[in-house]
């Protein structure tokens, strides 16, 4: 994550100490979240290095790092088709926002998100247990929407911003309370 990017208002900490994003993915994800919930605290936890690939141990360590520091929300703008059993003991201890159709997004107690190309970036909708949000990040001057990054990563990021905003006025920040608040808005 690049803390000097003009779309990033601040970063309150991170892991590892050098959490600089060489790909731009984490920066675009955080910018989308911060746009919707500018007053939340933000910590960058890097799981990608020089490519959009990681391993299950890095993901589990990142979630555990967040839990150990009593974070309220973990954005996982990624997913895997395996390892549900490794995510299960963690997702009940923090609000996780992740991609539908993958793990941990398809586990009970996770805010699962799918992209909707027709929804505005300042809106979301819910069908059953799945939230739908725009798959586009914040606009970049001089870059058309079609040439910018897009996809489920940014739908998850946009929804994470809505989750963070919903948590601002909740004393009970359990999955169920947050889910119900999001459904009612």
Where are these regions (language model features)?
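Extracellular S/T/G-rich loop segment that most often corresponds to the catalytic His/Ser-adjacent loop
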Residues: 100-168
